[in-house]
Amino acid sequence: MGDQPRRDKSLRDKPWIFRTYAGHSTAAASNELYRKNLSKGQTGLSVAFDLPTQTGYDSDHPLAKGEVGKVGVPVSHIGDMRALFEAIPLGEMNTSMTINATAAWLLALYVALADEQDVPRAKLQGTTQNDIIKEYLSRGTYVFPPAPSMRLTKDVILFTTKEMPKWNPMNVCSYHLQEAGATPVQELAFALATAIGVLDAVRASGQCAPEEFGDVVGRISFFVNAGLRFVTEICKLRAFTELWDEITRERYGVTDAKQRLFRYGVQVNSLGLTEQQPENNVARILLEMLAVTLSKDARARAVQLPAWNEALGLPRPFDQQWSLRMQQILAYETDLLEYGDVFAGSPVIAAKVAELKAAAKDELKHIEAMGGTVKAVESGYLKQRLVESNCRRIEAIERGEQIVVGVNRFTETEASPLTDAAESVVTVSAEAESGQIERLAAWRAARDPKAVAAALEALRRAAKSGANIMPPS
């Protein structure tokens, strides 16, 4: 281990895409934040939508009250999408959209905006998260039952494969599973079971020619978590890489090695960020980032880091800049990208990877025996396993068996100048919500009601007939 020759600097590995997860208040305010972050060296966008947008409610719906713009940007129509990407050329951008239950419609708005900018759809690069299965297990922003949700996911995949070949139509999310308490084995197995369920649905639909199925597989990406158990996380990512290669080759017959690559982006663990002594979170975030970048054979291709104070509230631009600079320092000031895989040949790493793979395969067999991931969700099995794991995690912290610095050990502290300021986090004003509602009312008043009715009827027909819902969206 570590005895590989130094790589020629001309053969440096390319840095991953630098992102920050951002969006709040209004589309215009979020656009200003995006352009500011891009000017600081960020190389991709990661859009956070507010809860009404994630669950299909317009900003003026009674259930949206108090949530508009609070944890993300509100988008109700193409006008909001225009404001969100004002002066940002979509043909030159790599955009990740954290959207699931309403992914088809948010992607449709993005494509419509690209059409307005005369950007060929084939040139668009980015990702729709579009993993509705994990919504039943962790986040809860689902709209439809599991089976119809799987149909929506399938439609987006089939549409982008033909129209947007550089787009990742789905980010299979193990990230949220870990946030909900998943063990590394559960994170591996549950995420891979979701990917299998989706690919099986695409193949069974009869809407994808066999010779095109490899293209579908090749565009599936993953959104992975990385916690502080450093060695285990490195091994988990290597296990993901090896298991995905096996599944795509053996189950789906994909012969192109490039299409079998485990392509993933990452946000490091937010669950472990603490309100107590939040300055310690800087060290946590940096260590977790190392777990997804050190191992070249399983290195993330896109990274977004939470800000140190996200346990307290929405981060300020300065806080997001701090996280961005951590990525840039690692990529450009260290020699990390000049070497091959520094863990290759390590018996410790190999043994742990083998252990994780074997346990994940056993869990995958169990899920398959239940009828697959949808059945495992409907039965409550997957949710029950996550709840049990999370209870064990919390109990270990409360008993002091799992040490969390500043929480259950080393709790004496000085006052922090970082959190003493009155505006140490961003707050969303009530005026942001009222202004959004006023703009939405004006938009509705100006549109052609006949065109609206015709568009909704076309979408309704597609939904009922089984046709792909993306074109009429």
Predicted regions and their residues:
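Flexible, glycine-rich loop/tail regions that form catalytic "lids" or insertion modules at the edges
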Residues: M1, R316-P317, Q321-Q328, Y332-S473
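Glycine-rich anion/phosphate-binding loop at the beta-strand->alpha-helix junction
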Residues: L192-A195, F222-N225, F230-P315, D319-S323
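A glycine-rich phosphate-binding loop feature that marks nucleotide/adenosyl-phosphate handling sites
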Residues: L51-P52, A101, T127-I133, N171-E179, ...
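Mobile "lid/hinge" segments at catalytic clefts and subdomain interfaces of large enzymes
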Residues: D131-K134, S149-G206, A283-L364, M370
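Catalytic alpha/beta active-site cores
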Residues: M1-E233, R251-V254, K258-G265, R301-P306
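Conserved, mostly hydrophobic/aromatic
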Residues: G41, H77, D118, W244, ...
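Short, acidic/polar
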Residues: A27-K36, V282-L290, V407
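Short beta-alpha connecting loops at secondary-structure transitions
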Residues: K65-K70, T95, K134-F144, L177-G181, ...
